[in-house]
UniProtKB/Swiss-Prot annotation:
GO-annotated molecular function: rRNA binding; structural constituent of ribosome
Residue ranges, annotated region (Disordered): 1-31, 117-137
Biased composition (Basic residues): 12-21
Protein name (record): Small ribosomal subunit protein uS11
Biological-process GO terms, alphabetical: translation
GO CC terms: ribonucleoprotein complex; ribosome
Name of encoding gene: rpsK
Domain of life: Bacteria
Subunit structure of this chain's protein: Part of the 30S ribosomal subunit. Interacts with proteins S7 and S18. Binds to IF-3.
UniProt source species: Rhodococcus jostii (strain RHA1)
InterPro entries: Ribosomal_uS11 (IPR001971), Ribosomal_uS11_bac-type (IPR019981), Ribosomal_uS11_CS (IPR018102), Ribosomal_uS11_sf (IPR036967)
Family (UniProt): Belongs to the universal ribosomal protein uS11 family.
Record function comment: Located on the platform of the 30S subunit, it bridges several disparate RNA helices of the 16S rRNA. Forms part of the Shine-Dalgarno cleft in the 70S ribosome.
Keywords: Ribonucleoprotein, Ribosomal protein, RNA-binding, rRNA-binding
NCBIfam families named among the record's database cross-references: PRK05309.1, uS11_bact
Amino acid sequence: MPPKSRGTGPKKTQKARRRDKKNVPHGAAHIKSTFNNTIVSITDPAGNVISWASSGHVGFKGSRKSTPFAAQLAAENAARKAQEHGVKKVDVFVKGPGSGRETAIRSLQAAGLEVGTISDVTPQPHNGCRPPKRRRV
């Protein structure tokens, strides 16, 4: 078995992928708000992601990711990127118990997207997994 070469061969350069601008006037905004983070994804009607942002992606770390302000900035960032692809109207699907739910919806409206329907798609267990123990503060 020949010894492995340590980067002495020719370098393979990867061609940068070109993002083509889609023209999607109507989409869906999926807001997943957990106790630790908020993730906003804007998709086309088929479910393909057009743009996304999260509290951590916007620049917050640790416990600041779970704040409503971080969710607001994440939603504005995702909305701005989606508007570059022609999105004007969205239906909002909210999932999770986090603190950034309402703030993210409001900031989508403030960013210039017209919000059609708002639906809560939080999964409810039919006595599935055992929940985490109660906090004693």
